[in-house]
Every structure is written in structure tokens, then in C-alpha cells.
Amino acid sequence: MAPAASELKLGKKVNEGKTKEVYELPDIPGCVLMQSKDQITAGNAARKDRMEGKAAISNTTTSCVFQLLQEAGIKTAFVRKQSDTAFIAAHCEMIPIEWVCRRIATGSFLKRNPGVKEGYKFYPPKIEMFYKDDANNDPQWSEEQLIEAKFSFAGLTIGKTEVDIMARSTQAIFEILEKSWQPQNCTLVDLKIEFGVNILTKEIVLADVIDNDSWRLWPSGDRSQQKDKQSYRDLKEVTPEALQMVKRNFEWVAERVELLLKTKSQGRVVVLMGSTSDLGHCEKIKKACATFGIPCELRVTSAHKGPDETLRIKAEYEGDGIPTVFVAVAGRSNGLGPVMSGNTAYPVVNCPPLSSDWGAQDVWSSLRLPSGLGCPTTLSPEGAAQFAAQIFGLNNHLVWAKLRSNMLNTWISLKQADKKLRECTL
């Protein structure tokens, strides 16, 4: 069990950067303490000022962002917020690359790409990488340069597979945060992140911090309202009044970033089964819904034997105003799905539990339907839950984040399996 905050013992200082210090934690093997500073910098510390309260503001922002990503399913080094100004993270050997993902062309991109106008939008987002070298102003690197560097961290050699994983992860992380800021009417313009190799698990994880130094954030998509560190970079002269303006911007972001962990959007799945003999199949749907954070209710009703009760149950859920996806589970002769689809404007999906003997025939009661009915069919309980999640994800960034993370993790697992197989056959 981790020690209480008052008992936390600090070991040696592992690293110190412009805005934070990293300490070993002897009582928590494999973890470090990330301690923020009340300091703000720009231009590789060419401009540097003390900003009272920045450590707490940055720690709040980072902790909320990492919690959001971790709950979505992104692998991060974040463990927990330890104090107002520090958090505990897995000890990683850091990969000295800053990964940048851009939706809108601005800043240094315009200087490096003459002729591109500010505001140009990238579809998909633009991925760039920069080697961390203060003496040379963090030069931009290509994928080939990173591969040929043959870096090794915590025993993991950074090759083509690892570079691809970091690039793919950077895009997914950006898109999750971009989607999360949209309900706050804020445009995430670009994002800078770093990865490390966990010294215990030997896997690449999102590490370091993501705070208001890490992105450009434009309320209402308006650059003149920028709330990020660019407001500090743009100062012609740093005065106490100007620094207070910058601090207010940082506080504005820290207050709103906590809202990213919540959603005003409601939603639920209601599984209708024709018989309790199908309960096991329905429980799988409910379990899969839980992985997306979607409430799921199970009901028993037969559209053949009690159509009046089926329609009464339908009206019950239509009447409370909560967005609902109905899943019809009936195998032998699916009346539930078609009857529900023909009598509600809510989405209905069929998920019949087909038997091995008559399944090939029974499935047609879910597939061949009269005109005016729109209930798709999936045989997978997990597929039915995912179908519902994709509907709710249109208006719920937390559900969407889990879907996007699942896509990334599936891609990574295939990439790693391919690498392992190739290594075994060489």
C-alpha cells in the first residue's frame, strides 16, 4: 500500500527541468514524484519568470488531463495526484523527442513552411517530431533520423515499430483532447507531448506532463482569445500586470480542465430479451456497456406473446427523456427488434443468440424485414454495446474517448504481435 502524503519519503533527485523536479520514491518502487515549480519560461528559457501559484495550476491541469486519458484507456505514466503541486508517476526513461500534433497551422510551422497561411487546417492532424537539444533549439527530426539514432531506453530499442506506435498514439491523444475541449467551446489548435519507457514494464507510455505549456487553446476558435502559454510568449515586455494576465489565463484553463472529466450528456442501453434463457447473452452486453461507462438495464418481454407489454416498456423509456438505445435479444424468431423498430424513433439493434442447429435459418427473422424498419443486426454482444457507444459518442466525449482509445490499443497490439512474430522467424 502506498504511504500517506505526510509519510512520503523523497529519494535522490532524478532530473530537474525548467518547470519541474523529479525525485525517486524509495517507499514506492518504480515510481517518482513530479514536483512542479512556480516558473514560466519561453524560447528555451531565454525568457524566464517566477509566477506565484503556477506550480499548483500546472499540477491541476496535468493531473486532470492524465486522468482523462488514463480512464479512456491510454497508457500513461500517471499514478495519482499527490499534493497541490506534485503528482506520482511511474519511473520512465524518457525518449528525447517532443511529438507535436497540429490541427491548425500557426506558430513555428508557418516559419518553417513559407507560403502556408495561418489557419490552414490539417486533415488528418499533422504529426511532427523535434529532438530535445536546447543548444540547437530542438531541431525537427524525420522518422528516419529517429530510427537511425538507435536509441535504447530501459532495455527497449527504439525502432520502426516503436516510432509508429508513438506517432499513432500522438494522433489519438490529440483527437481525444480535441474532442474533450469541444463542449467547452474551445479549439485545441496543437499539442506537444513526450513518451518514456516504463522501467518496470518496458513499454512505451505517455509521460512527462500535459499542462498549459503543452498546447494552444483558442476559445471559440479565436486566436485573439488564446488562453495558453502563447499569451506569455507574445508579451513585448513582462510587467507584473502582464504576468497577472497570463496567470489568469492559466487559472481559466485549470478551472475548465476539471470539466473535461464530466459530461452533461446522458444515455443508456436497454436490453430486451424474449426469455430469461437468454440472460447469459444479455449479461455480456451489459458487461461490455460498462467498459464504455454506459448504464445498461435488462428487461424480459415477448413481442409475440405480449406485444402490449413490449410497447408499454418502450413507452416507459421514451417518457423520461433519457437518450436510449434498445437492443433486442431474441433468437428463434425475432419479433422484438422489428416490432420495436416499427414503433419507436429511438435506435434499435438486433443481437440474436443463435443456436448451432437452427441459427442459419433463425437469423433471417432479424435480417429480412419489411420496409420502414431500420434495426441493424450483430451477432456479437460486444458488437451491440459498441454500436450503442458509437451513437452516444457523437455527443459524449468520454464515451468517444474510450472508443478512440480502443482503436489505438487494438492497432498497437497488432503492431507488437507482428514485431514479435518477425523476431521469432528471423
From Swiss-Prot:
Q: Does the keyword Zinc apply?
A: no
**Domain of life assignment:** Eukaryota
Task: Please give the subunit comment from the record.
Answer: Homooctamer.
**One Pfam entry name:** AIRC
> Lineage, please?
Eukaryota, Metazoa, Chordata, Craniata, Vertebrata
Keyword line: ATP-binding, Decarboxylase, Ligase, Lyase, Multifunctional enzyme, Nucleotide-binding, Purine biosynthesis
| Residue segments, region AIR carboxylase | 262-426
What is the protein's species of origin?
Gallus gallus
InterPro entries assigned = PurE_classII, PurE_dom, SAICAR_synt/ADE2_N, SAICAR_synthetase, SAICAR_synthetase_CS
Query: Which EC number(s) does the record attach to this protein?
Result: 6.3.2.6, 4.1.1.21
Give GO terms: molecular function aspect only: ATP binding; phosphoribosylaminoimidazole carboxylase activity; phosphoribosylaminoimidazolesuccinocarboxamide synthase activity
Q: What is catalyzed by this enzyme?
A: 5-amino-1-(5-phospho-D-ribosyl)imidazole-4-carboxylate + L-aspartate + ATP = (2S)-2-[5-amino-1-(5-phospho-beta-D-ribosyl)imidazole-4-carboxamido]succinate + ADP + phosphate + 2 H(+); 5-amino-1-(5-phospho-D-ribosyl)imidazole-4-carboxylate + H(+) = 5-amino-1-(5-phospho-beta-D-ribosyl)imidazole + CO2
Q: Which family does it belong to?
A: In the N-terminal section; belongs to the SAICAR synthetase family. In the C-terminal section; belongs to the AIR carboxylase family. Class II subfamily.
Q: List the disulfide bonds.
A: none
Q: What is this protein called?
A: Multifunctional protein ADE2
Q: Region SAICAR synthetase: start and end of each range?
A: 1-261
Q: In which pathway does it act?
A: Purine metabolism; IMP biosynthesis via de novo pathway; 5-amino-1-(5-phospho-D-ribosyl)imidazole-4-carboxamide from 5-amino-1-(5-phospho-D-ribosyl)imidazole-4-carboxylate: step 1/2; Purine metabolism; IMP biosynthesis via de novo pathway; 5-amino-1-(5-phospho-D-ribosyl)imidazole-4-carboxylate from 5-amino-1-(5-phospho-D-ribosyl)imidazole (carboxylase route): step 1/1
GO BP of this protein: 'de novo' IMP biosynthetic process
* Record keyword Lipid metabolism present: no
Q: Which GO terms describe its cellular component?
A: cytosol
Q: Which SUPFAM superfamilies match?
A: N5-CAIR mutase (phosphoribosylaminoimidazole carboxylase, PurE), SAICAR synthase-like
